[in-house]
């Protein structure tokens, strides 16, 4: 029998400031981080404050659906 699927899933965190209009950026585009989360411990979407090299500052990165 196959092993039961784990509770860990891969999630993509997208810079919230890059998706807004009129934000001063170094490069065009949107920056994304790839990480893992435990579905049982964190059922709500992740929101982390991380550095965005496009905006050149620490911004809120929110989980997106892929």
Curated annotation (Swiss-Prot):
It is found in: Plastid, Chloroplast. Its main location: plastid. Keywords: Chloroplast, Plastid, Ribonucleoprotein, Ribosomal protein. GO terms for biological process: translation. It holds the Pfam family Ribosomal_L33. SUPFAM superfamilies: Zn-binding ribosomal proteins (SSF57829). PROSITE patterns: RIBOSOMAL_L33 (PS00582). GO terms for molecular function: structural constituent of ribosome. GO terms for cellular component: chloroplast; ribonucleoprotein complex; ribosome. Belongs to the bacterial ribosomal protein bL33 family. NCBIfam families: PRK00504.1, PRK00595.1, rpmG_bact. This is Large ribosomal subunit protein bL33c. It comes from Gnetum parvifolium. The lineage of its organism: Eukaryota, Viridiplantae, Streptophyta, Embryophyta, Tracheophyta.
């Amino acid at each position: 029998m196959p092993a039961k699927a784990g509770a860990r899933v891969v999630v993509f965190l997208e810079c919230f400031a890059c998706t807004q209009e009129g934000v001063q950026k170094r490069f065009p585009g949107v920056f994304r981080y790839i990480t893992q989360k435990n579905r049982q411990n964190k059922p709500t979407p992740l929101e982390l404050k991380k550095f965005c090299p496009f905006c050149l500052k620490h911004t809120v990165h929110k989980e997106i659906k892929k």
